[in-house]
Amino acid sequence: MLIIPAIDIKEGKCVRLTRGDFSQKKIYLDNPNDMAIIWRKQNAKMLHIVDLDAALTGEMVNFEKIREIVTNLDIPVQVGGGIRSADAVKRYLDIGVGRVVIGSAAVTNPKLVEELLHTYTSSQIVVGIDAENGIPKIKGWTESSMIQDYDLALQMKEMGIERIIYTDISRDGMMQGFGYESTRRFAERAGMKITASGGVTNAEDLHRLNELQPFGVDSVIIGKALYECNFPCQELWYNFEEEISLDHNFSTARKK
């Protein structure tokens, strides 16, 4: 089970939201690049970055912040948030982003996904489905779609998408555990590679999530629980906090 730390960027800062509510924003660091280096020092093998401003507006507001992170790291970075055009995808891939996450556009403009898969590989293009009660939400989770989450996944699968990032919005940022049943239901019906997201709070959640590997769930994105140091192994790192410098020497970690 690959654990992928999340970095959400709003107005240039590293933040976390609760259930995607922009009014419930907590700033963790002013510079997202510093946060990326800290996660790399803690042996992250991949990072998940979301441009929250772009998710609302469709404009690549934090592009330069993301470029800085990609330039400074030696691990794959996947990026999502407001990516609704082929040009946006190209710009991200051109700066070294390993994987681009298509969210709202998979609902509003599915032909874009089809076109992208003619140009790029299925490892570079994945679809993010952020669902509440089985209904995908779009445009920064401000609007509901008219399709079931698994139906959307099957449409994307038919086009050639191989991986879905599945978020149970009702659990995201709540620190109350992940949606085991909703994630299992979705994974069983989709029959695809699944990266789970939303609500993982502690090691027990990870053990339960591991039970879903037979259904294709092979990785998990974790945000607030990592920022709040909810895992015992993090205590070991922070006992040696002076050694977690913000340079680019990653000798303490190995690239997968």
Curated annotation (Swiss-Prot):
Pathway(s) this gene product operates in, as recorded in its UniProt entry: Amino-acid biosynthesis; L-histidine biosynthesis; L-histidine from 5-phospho-alpha-D-ribose 1-diphosphate: step 4/9
EC number(s) recorded for this UniProt protein: 5.3.1.16
GO BP annotation list: L-histidine biosynthetic process; L-tryptophan biosynthetic process
Class of enzymatic activity (EC top level): isomerase
InterPro entries noted in UniProt: Aldolase_TIM, His_biosynth, HisA_bact_arch, Isoase_HisA-like, Isoase_HisA-like_bact, RibuloseP-bd_barrel
Any one Gene Ontology molecular-function term assigned to this protein's record: 1-(5-phosphoribosyl)-5-[(5-phosphoribosylamino)methylideneamino]imidazole-4-carboxamide isomerase activity
GO cellular component, as recorded: cytoplasm
Record keywords: Amino-acid biosynthesis, Cytoplasm, Histidine biosynthesis, Isomerase
Main location: cytoplasm
Protein localization: Cytoplasm
Catalytic activity annotation: 1-(5-phospho-beta-D-ribosyl)-5-[(5-phospho-beta-D-ribosylamino)methylideneamino]imidazole-4-carboxamide = 5-[(5-phospho-1-deoxy-D-ribulos-1-ylimino)methylamino]-1-(5-phospho-beta-D-ribosyl)imidazole-4-carboxamide
Disulfide bonds: none
Active site (UniProt): 8, 130
CDD domains given in the database record: HisA
PANTHER family: 1-(5-PHOSPHORIBOSYL)-5-[(5-PHOSPHORIBOSYLAMINO)METHYLIDENEAMINO] IMIDAZOLE-4-CARBOXAMIDE ISOMERASE
NCBIfam families documented for this protein: 1-(5-phosphoribosyl)-5-[(5-phosphoribosylamino)methylideneamino]imidazole-4-carboxamide isomerase
Family: Belongs to the HisA/HisF family.
Protein name: 1-(5-phosphoribosyl)-5-[(5-phosphoribosylamino)methylideneamino] imidazole-4-carboxamide isomerase
Source species of the chain: Pelodictyon phaeoclathratiforme (strain DSM 5477 / BU-1)
Chain's gene name: hisA
